[in-house]
Amino acid sequence: MPEPIRAVRGMNDILPDESGLWAFFEDTIRTWLAAYGYRNLRTPIVEQTDLFVRSIGEVTDIVEKEMYTFVDHLNGENLTLRPEGTASCVRAVIEHNLLYAGPQRLYYSGPMFRHERPQKGRYRQFHQVGVEALGFAGPDIDAELIVMCARLWRLLGISDVRLEISTLGSTESRSVYRARLISYLEKFCDDLDEDARRRLKTNPLRILDSKNPAMREILAGAPRLFDDLDEDSLAHFEALQRILRNQDISFEINNRLVRGLDYYNRTVFEWVTDKLGAQGTICAGGRYDGLIAQIGGKPAPACGFAMGIERILALMGENGAVGAHAIPDIYVVHQGEAAAEFSWKVAESLRDDGLKVVLHSGGGNFKAQMKKADASGARFAAIIGEDEVVAGQISIKPLREAAEQIRVDLAGAAALLGNI
């Protein structure tokens, strides 16, 4: 007997008992985003590798170590399974000239892929919802995105999260700070861990995000990015804080907050929880005013965020949330050949009336079928025997209430069930 084939490590099946919670989340997301005027954009899972090299940054962990990249043997193109969604969204906006009609509020959802070490809350295939506001320059749109998130947490019953915000300033002010940070860290060159030494000359701001306790001790005395902020970036950040306070959104300023993608500038933010261990960030984003031009479009400001669906569902599970199973309204049982044929008509007629119906399949006597009807969770069993076939009727037996079995015409069954 051959060995069974299993799912790829770090890429998980979503089983029927779990999919109810996914469906609830997805329905909530669509309603929530429509309330703010955001429209859905769907992009391919596979993109040109250069899209991510240009946008995310050539010396980031994602591009250097985590992307699933391959060469198309038909034409030699270098292709990559998307590791994140913002670059694909921006590419589509440029390619289809969407900004010609004015600023755009867009969102996407779907699977992303990174070749990481699988652990709780971190998978090689994971799912994100991303929200992007393109063509908006002011701090008001930054605030809108954060306020949107706060509303979503309420809709999902999530309360154990906190908001951390910061600013990365402009490209120019960040360059000044980068030089000061390198100069400071070089004094501790022998004490830096391997990751920090690698990043020192390529992406030193990412060192600020180190979780290594020894590195945190070194970083405690590091210069602050705030000290090198340009006036416009500082004014932008102060305006954002005013709006958040006016909207009663609590936040913490985290001077060490940086993002793992190179394209961010000015506002950055994360929603964090302590209930998921090391993978505590459930939503993160910020402003990326240079990305559209970087990918080849006409310069335009932009801001957005992405949230990890698996982490949010895990947090909902910690709070006791469960998804609704696809429980039928009615389970159709039948005895005899004529009844089996008539049961098809009954099931389809009830479905036409908007009911969720399971038609018994696989044979079995009446008692066995009724056990399956009860196990299905349905409120009612529709019983069809020879007498029902002759009369063109069905017998309705309540399964969850102490009520009498009744026989009704098929045409009036749905209305009757709605009144019981």
From Swiss-Prot:
Keywords: Aminoacyl-tRNA synthetase, ATP-binding, Cytoplasm, Ligase, Nucleotide-binding, Protein biosynthesis. Its EC number is 6.1.1.21. GO terms for cellular component: cytoplasm. It is found in: Cytoplasm. The keyword Aminoacyl-tRNA synthetase applies. InterPro entries: aa-tRNA-synth_II, aa-tRNA-synth_II/BPL/LPL, Anticodon-bd, Anticodon-bd_dom_sf, His-tRNA-ligase, HisRS-like_core, HisRS/HisZ, HisRS_anticodon. Gene3D superfamilies: Anticodon-binding domain, Bira Bifunctional Protein, Domain 2. PROSITE patterns: AA_TRNA_LIGASE_II. Pfam families: HGTP_anticodon (PF03129), tRNA-synt_His (PF13393). CDD domains: HisRS-like_core (cd00773), HisRS_anticodon (cd00859). It is an enzyme of class 6 (ligase). Its main location: cytoplasm. One of its GO terms (biological process) is histidyl-tRNA aminoacylation. Belongs to the class-II aminoacyl-tRNA synthetase family. PANTHER family: HISTIDINE--TRNA LIGASE, MITOCHONDRIAL-RELATED, HISTIDYL-TRNA SYNTHETASE. Homodimer. This is Histidine--tRNA ligase. It comes from Nitrosomonas europaea (strain ATCC 19718 / CIP 103999 / KCTC 2705 / NBRC 14298). The gene is hisS.
